[in-house]
């Protein structure tokens, strides 16, 4: 079920509902300098013709920084979705949803650009991205 992929992490979808599609504006939950980003691509997601690719908790996305420090603005970077408003079901039967959507800016190898993550992150994202989980304050 889980396979080693190009980005150096084990990919396993857990059946997470995808709550963020291409074009969504999402706040950034770390201190990398970016405040708000727009999702421009979801790597390795194949979908039907003319359907927008979407991402869920734990997915890697390509984003464009829209608001933030002058050094970060207008850059195209990778990010990991750590929170989403749309409810998703865990294997034990519980449903989880957060108050907001949020991403964490990462390098292509999965190391976070910031040194701390504000707010909780989902357990699915923490298991899939251990380096992001290391700087998180709370895992739900």
Swiss-Prot record:
GO molecular function: large ribosomal subunit rRNA binding; structural constituent of ribosome
Transmembrane region(s): none
Chain's role: Binds to 23S rRNA. Forms part of two intersubunit bridges in the 70S ribosome.
Family listed: Belongs to the universal ribosomal protein uL14 family.
Subunit structure, as described in the record: Part of the 50S ribosomal subunit. Forms a cluster with proteins L3 and L24e, part of which may contact the 16S rRNA in 2 intersubunit bridges.
Protein known as: Large ribosomal subunit protein uL14
Any single Gene Ontology cellular-component annotation: cytosolic large ribosomal subunit
Keyword Isomerase among UniProt keywords: no
One Pfam family linked to the record: Ribosomal_L14
Single GO biological process annotation from the record: translation
CDD domains referenced in this protein's UniProt entry, alphabetically: Ribosomal_uL14
Alphabetically ordered keywords of this record: Ribonucleoprotein, Ribosomal protein, RNA-binding, rRNA-binding
Organism in which the protein naturally occurs: Aeropyrum pernix (strain ATCC 700893 / DSM 11879 / JCM 9820 / NBRC 100138 / K1)
């Amino acid at each position: 079920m889980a396979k080693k992929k190009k980005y150096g992490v084990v990919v396993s979808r857990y059946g997470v509902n995808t709550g963020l599609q291409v074009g969504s504006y999402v706040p950034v939950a770390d201190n990398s300098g970016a405040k708000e980003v727009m999702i421009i691509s979801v790597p390795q997601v194949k979908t039907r013709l003319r359907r927008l690719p979407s991402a869920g908790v734990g997915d890697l996305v390509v984003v464009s920084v829209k608001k933030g420090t002058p050094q970060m603005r207008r850059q195209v970077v990778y990010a990991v979705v750590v929170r989403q408003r749309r409810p998703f079901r865990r294997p034990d039967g519980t449903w989880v949803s957060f108050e907001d959507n949020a991403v964490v800016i990462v390098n292509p190898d999965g190391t976070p650009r910031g040194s701390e993550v504000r707010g909780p992150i989902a357990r699915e994202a923490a298991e899939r991205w251990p380096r992001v989980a290391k700087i998180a304050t709370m895992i739900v």
